[in-house]
Amino acid sequence: MACPWQFLFKIKSQKVDLTTELDINNNVRKGHQPPSSPVTQDDPKRHSPGKHGNESPQPLTGTVKTSPDPLGKLDAPPSACPRHVRIKNWGSGVTFQDTLHQKAKGDLSCKSKSCLASIMNPKSLTIGPRDKPTPPDELLPQAIEFVNQYYGSFKEAKIEEHLARVEAVTKEIETTGTYQLTGDELIFATKQAWRNAPRCIGRIQWSNLQVFDARSCSTAQEMFEHICRHVRYATNNGNIRSAITVFPQRSDGKHDFRVWNAQLIRYAGYQMPDGSIRGDPASVEFTQLCIDLGWKPKFSRFDVLPLVLQADGRDPELFEIPPDLVLEVPMEHPRYEWFQELELKWYALPAVANMLLEVGGLEFPGCPFNGWYMGTEVGVRDFCDVQRYNILEEVGRRMGLETHKLASLWKDRAVVEINVAVLHSFQKQNVTIMDHHSAAESFMKYMQNEYRSRGGCPADWIWLVPPISGSITPVFHQEMLNYILSPFYYYQVEAWKTHVWQDERRRPQRREIRFKVLIKAVFFASVLMQKAMSSRVRATILFATETGRSETLAQDLGALFSCAFNPKVLCMDQYQLSHLEEEQLLLVVTSTFGNGDSPGNGEKLKKSLLMLKELTNKFRYAVFGLGSSMYPQFCAFAHDIDQKLSQLGASQLAPTGEGDELSGQEEAFRSWAVQTFKAACEIFDVSGKHHIEIPKLYTSSVTWDPHHYRLVQDSEPLDLNKALSSMHAKPVFTMRLKSQQNLQSPKSSRTTLLVELSCEGSQAPSYLPGEHLGVFPCNQPALVQGILERVVDGPAPHQPVRLETLCENGSYWVKDKRLPPCSLSQALTHFLDITTPPTQLLLRKLAQLATEEAERQRLETLCQPSDYNKWKFTNSPTFLEVLEEFPSLRVSASFLLSQLPILKPRYYSISSSRDLRPTEIHLTVAVLTYRTRDGQGPLHHGVCSTWLSSLKPQDPVPCFVRSASGFQLPEDRSRPCILIGPGTGIAPFRSFWQQRLHEAEHKGLQGGRMTLVFGCRRPEEDHLYWEEMLEMARKGVLHEVHTAYSRLPDQPKVYVQDILRQRLAGEVLRVLHEEQGHLYVCGDVRMARDVAHSLKQLMATALSLDEEQVEDYFFQLKSQKRYHEDIFGAVFPYEMKKDGAAPSDPRAPGANRS
């Protein structure tokens, strides 16, 4: 056959038809192959090619040369200017003109009316299996085009060699129906395919690819040996080198050489019996295939999968990768020691194994290749994707972030730290990795080079922009043109979905259901479910929360109502009030915040709902409130919603439920939920309502089964900070007591301490004035010892043990994650709450442990709400007092470790400025003592305040800083402020005036007027920080100081709200209304309520506002973050009934939050 000159020369007499219809997706004329243009490419003649045969593959390398195309005249385009696409960088303003796209091969998936650019594996980038060879008339022009491209890469023209090669390829195709690439051509093709890969950000290294020619192998064993050689070379003890191994090309499609693995090294994923996934979820299907083929799984999180290799179209064979070939990097963080507890690791070599190399009409379905990692590939995609290891929320919790609030940006902060850990870990082990910023910069340099050398650069913007950092990377602002050039790496259909099995006995049984059939079945079931759900009564479930507790219960409620209704769970701030006119059933689960207010994400709905005047749709509703009965406005927001909906004409489905944090909140919710669900089924006449199977959550037994728990000896020493960090998801650190000072005079019967803590390092942790310190206290030794003396069948008090629980099916024991391994004495001292009165649920379980029948009956009686509340508020018993009241109780160590509640941290407003005291944190602590039973009962002590008062200098204090973004000094320091804080409410204001003092003396900054309103009993008894206040007033930090004394002899009681009305009415009006200033209130809930009431009266009088207008005025103040409240000091109900007074321990802002 003569040389096909028509593929080598162009007929110059052709004219360009400027009216030809264009393919708008590829910028070429439809039905017309765009003309070639000069290309600057690698010079393969500088490589050292290997020879074919049965020898080991030889490394083939090459370097880049740039020069004009010597055969450009042979491949000259028609006499018309080449069409170009202008590409702009919107960050720098630089533009490129892309002409290379005219050489694009085939069409992309996009259509004239839809863009498919974000499809993961589009058909245009995928090559499926073949059942016959490529016809010679299709193969020949592609082969000649590649040969032209190859010889066009030389610096000097080699026309005779070029023409001879074209002639040889032509004859080979005519004779055999195909042709073979030379070693140099293979090197050129693999590198050029990498250069053309639009989804790769690291192409600047394309010319440094190491090529292993394995086209001579014939068996799976030989393939395995080649791959082992590849992995060893590429890993290089961590100094990763890019490489590719090329197995024999496809012939008739029935004798393919393929690697079935997606990557040469990848972790297994196991579908466990309970539905959970252990390991990498992305590998579940392939892992099961390996098991079906005979692999023995290990069932750990990071098991390296075996290689599944197919040679010459035969059935695949399994090969375990030698462990010494797999370099793995254990993950750690440069600052967070707990990161190692996650026990994460990742393999060092990213080697894609299942793509196909297309070159000159030839297809190589087996061509595993590797580069090195960009940090985000591991830190974002592998670790944080919800369909992968999904560690983001766990890391966020351990960092102490507000993971229940999307607006807190906890995801962004956590994902950055995970990526910091990945980069740090790889670099510490001297393993090659590149951060995404450097990768983006290198791609921009590569792109400039490509436009300069060959007039274009195919690029997929969606894939090249890193998964984090977005617009702060340069690639984000770069317009890109995406097209397919040849040679090219294509995706393939998974091998196990198309393989024709020669031994049917080895075919995995799990593939008996074809994928298409399965999809159709799932789709059909989905349609049926949608129809079923659409025919059900719609139920909207709204929640408002500060800590996430209400959201959790709302989701549980949604699971219950999905058994018979069509529920939708929404946060209140996502709900449109206009939808009330369309509701059939509305359910609300909400906490109450502060002084009877709504949580932050309920404010918008609250305001809109209260302003609503009428409702034409009379739907059904039910409300459940969460809170703490220690607060006088218990569940107030929930009752406000109930009252308003009733006023609007909606019908109450069930009485408003109340979940008391101190009295069986979960049990109360479950009871209310089931009652509401049954009532809804009756009202809406749900079909089969008496036979509905409800979730196990609502039917599970509340009994204690000792056979489900056991204690096992453990030798691991207790790291207290590490344990507390893990349990509470807080970044715990240790401060040490520097000093204590009683701020009250010797005349006072009460104690208020200034606690000064010093840090172990050079500087205290970062905090702002107004923020809180969470302190982890210890229980009193006497209480701990009393309980230890009553434990039966327990280990030695100081013997470290771990609690294990029996799994649901009873087949194995698992470590209980609630507590760390520790001794019983340590658990009772540091981790378990032994002072809060037992809940009704705990009493019910204790009843099972009573050996005296009378005591058992008494405990069961106390489980009833009326008896329980009277007993609880009269005695407020500690757990030791319960054991003393019911001496026949036989309580085991496993019962204590599994059933007692967790000891919570206590929060105190920080009373110092970090700028003024960089190595210290100060607290203002009221030490709580009180007697129960109307003063006749045993003496009780506040847990944390008493513990702090007992410390000696240098004793450790485990703690953490909690943000209080709503209670900080104004960003504009010139704004005037009014500070209102009686008693220990002065605590955060001390940090305010210390900060202002530092700014004035060290930075020369003068703040706006700061007026302080303080309240106490008598000046000579409990005027806290009196001398400091006078000094701050003398230095001009405090503009004025006003004090309200409530216990002066022969004088009427004066409170802070009286000072506001009598002395500061004009100042309040100026600060809040005229000068856009700020007002801060810190103290117990009753004081905050009275202050708010007085302020509203004052402003209503001054501005002539009615009740609704003044409520809206203060709502706007809070929305503008100019009215700040830090409320603490819960009120005990039994004391409220007695005299309306109450002590306040612990300082717990937000104790009435969900």
Curated annotation (Swiss-Prot):
<dbReference type="InterPro" id="IPR039261">
    <property type="entry name" value="FNR_nucleotide-bd"/>
</dbReference>
<feature type="binding site">
    <location>
        <position position="591"/>
    </location>
    <ligand>
        <name>FMN</name>
    </ligand>
</feature>
<feature type="domain" description="FAD-binding FR-type">
    <location>
        <begin position="730"/>
        <end position="970"/>
    </location>
</feature>
<dbReference type="GO" id="GO:0006809">
    <property type="term" value="P:nitric oxide biosynthetic process"/>
</dbReference>
<feature type="binding site">
    <location>
        <position position="926"/>
    </location>
    <ligand>
        <name>FAD</name>
    </ligand>
</feature>
<feature type="binding site">
    <location>
        <position position="1057"/>
    </location>
    <ligand>
        <name>NADP(+)</name>
    </ligand>
</feature>
<feature type="binding site">
    <location>
        <position position="462"/>
    </location>
    <ligand>
        <name>(6R)-L-erythro-5,6,7,8-tetrahydrobiopterin</name>
    </ligand>
</feature>
<feature type="binding site">
    <location>
        <position position="984"/>
    </location>
    <ligand>
        <name>NADP(+)</name>
    </ligand>
</feature>
<feature type="binding site">
    <location>
        <position position="545"/>
    </location>
    <ligand>
        <name>FMN</name>
    </ligand>
</feature>
<dbReference type="GO" id="GO:0034618">
    <property type="term" value="F:arginine binding"/>
</dbReference>
<dbReference type="GO" id="GO:0050660">
    <property type="term" value="F:flavin adenine dinucleotide binding"/>
</dbReference>
<feature type="binding site">
    <location>
        <position position="665"/>
    </location>
    <ligand>
        <name>FMN</name>
    </ligand>
</feature>
<dbReference type="GO" id="GO:0007623">
    <property type="term" value="P:circadian rhythm"/>
</dbReference>
<feature type="binding site">
    <location>
        <position position="750"/>
    </location>
    <ligand>
        <name>NADP(+)</name>
    </ligand>
</feature>
<feature type="binding site">
    <location>
        <position position="491"/>
    </location>
    <ligand>
        <name>heme b</name>
    </ligand>
</feature>
<feature type="binding site">
    <location>
        <position position="906"/>
    </location>
    <ligand>
        <name>FAD</name>
    </ligand>
</feature>
<feature type="binding site">
    <location>
        <position position="661"/>
    </location>
    <ligand>
        <name>FMN</name>
    </ligand>
</feature>
<dbReference type="GO" id="GO:0010629">
    <property type="term" value="P:negative regulation of gene expression"/>
</dbReference>
<feature type="binding site" description="axial binding residue">
    <location>
        <position position="200"/>
    </location>
    <ligand>
        <name>heme b</name>
    </ligand>
</feature>
<dbReference type="InterPro" id="IPR044944">
    <property type="entry name" value="NOS_dom_3"/>
</dbReference>
<feature type="binding site">
    <location>
        <position position="1047"/>
    </location>
    <ligand>
        <name>NADP(+)</name>
    </ligand>
</feature>
<feature type="binding site">
    <location>
        <position position="945"/>
    </location>
    <ligand>
        <name>FAD</name>
    </ligand>
</feature>
<feature type="binding site">
    <location>
        <position position="546"/>
    </location>
    <ligand>
        <name>FMN</name>
    </ligand>
</feature>
<keyword id="KW-0862">Zinc</keyword>
<dbReference type="GO" id="GO:0071222">
    <property type="term" value="P:cellular response to lipopolysaccharide"/>
</dbReference>
<feature type="binding site">
    <location>
        <position position="772"/>
    </location>
    <ligand>
        <name>FAD</name>
    </ligand>
</feature>
<dbReference type="GO" id="GO:0005777">
    <property type="term" value="C:peroxisome"/>
</dbReference>
<dbReference type="GO" id="GO:0042127">
    <property type="term" value="P:regulation of cell population proliferation"/>
</dbReference>
<dbReference type="GO" id="GO:0032310">
    <property type="term" value="P:prostaglandin secretion"/>
</dbReference>
<dbReference type="GO" id="GO:0046872">
    <property type="term" value="F:metal ion binding"/>
</dbReference>
<keyword id="KW-0274">FAD</keyword>
<dbReference type="InterPro" id="IPR001709">
    <property type="entry name" value="Flavoprot_Pyr_Nucl_cyt_Rdtase"/>
</dbReference>
<feature type="binding site">
    <location>
        <position position="1046"/>
    </location>
    <ligand>
        <name>NADP(+)</name>
    </ligand>
</feature>
<dbReference type="GO" id="GO:0020037">
    <property type="term" value="F:heme binding"/>
</dbReference>
<dbReference type="GO" id="GO:1900015">
    <property type="term" value="P:regulation of cytokine production involved in inflammatory response"/>
</dbReference>
<feature type="region of interest" description="Calmodulin-binding">
    <location>
        <begin position="515"/>
        <end position="535"/>
    </location>
</feature>
<feature type="binding site">
    <location>
        <position position="628"/>
    </location>
    <ligand>
        <name>FMN</name>
    </ligand>
</feature>
<dbReference type="GO" id="GO:0034617">
    <property type="term" value="F:tetrahydrobiopterin binding"/>
</dbReference>
<dbReference type="GO" id="GO:0006527">
    <property type="term" value="P:arginine catabolic process"/>
</dbReference>
<feature type="binding site">
    <location>
        <position position="1053"/>
    </location>
    <ligand>
        <name>NADP(+)</name>
    </ligand>
</feature>
<comment type="similarity">
    <text>Belongs to the NOS family.</text>
</comment>
<dbReference type="GO" id="GO:0042742">
    <property type="term" value="P:defense response to bacterium"/>
</dbReference>
